[in-house]
Amino acid sequence: MLARNPLVEAMLNPQTYPEPTGKIELIQTHISFVFVTQNYVYKVKKPVNFGFLDFSTLEKRRANCEKELQLNRRLCPEIYLEVVPINQSKTLKIKGEGKTVEYALKMKRLPQECIMTQLLQEGKIDKKIIDQIAAIVAKFHSQAQTNSEISEFGSLRTVKTNWDENFTQTVKYINQTVPKADFEFMQTKINSFMDTNKALFESRISDKRIRDCHGDLHSGNIFVTDKICIFDAIEFNDRFRYSDVTADVAFLAMDLDYQKRTDLADYFIAQYIIYSKDTQLKQLLPFYKCYRAYVRGKVV
């Protein structure tokens, strides 16, 4: 099927690119084609509409490329380079002549062996690196945008809506992937926590802890080189980024727990609290770790 796609075929040809390159590797996800060249990565969005994301038109794909560039430059300005047009003349060419038929996000290529997930498996992540990540995330959150629209996503009403959606979408899997007793236990505990902590959720809003966060902060989205790069923030749906900062912290902590590095998870949380001075975060952490684990289980 891919061989019949003129765009994919062209992007696998070194002559399509503005700089010299050797063999090109294609990585395909359900929403993107990612072309890995010798020194760069070009990400092309597929023309799909899944409801929670809409890349169905060229203009929407361009706008989402621009938004992805803007959002990820907050944490990786040296990696996220530019949005480039793919033009059609006699052949398809990036930044070529003729009509623009597609857009790609151009990024600097980093070595895959520097992905944090792999380094964790190799035992190469220590507390010094975790401390650096905690400092970066705390500073990022302190500078991230917040306003009345964003703050609404931390309200008990919105948080409850998100949980209700989770339960509704997974009820059909009871006794298939989740035992009925576990499902009902989680539902009871989650609803009880929300019912008894209305003041806590309200104070998070008044303390301006609801921000335009990363939205997908796990070890698979962190490069650890001389400079740590947290990449791939969610651009296609603001709802997935606008949240209590605890949700970002909880995602990475949950991921470290999953990889049997609870020691690093605890250290990350402790250092984040020191850097952010957000002592209230501990009260919400189990709640949001459960949320992140539930969502990950839902989408896997």
Regions found by a protein language model. Give the residues of each.
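ATP-dependent phospho-/nucleotidyl transfer catalytic cores
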Residues: F52-S56, K93-E97, L105-S219, F223-V300
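Conserved NTP-binding catalytic cores of kinases and kinase-like/nucleotidyltransferase enzymes
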Residues: M1-K106, T225-I228
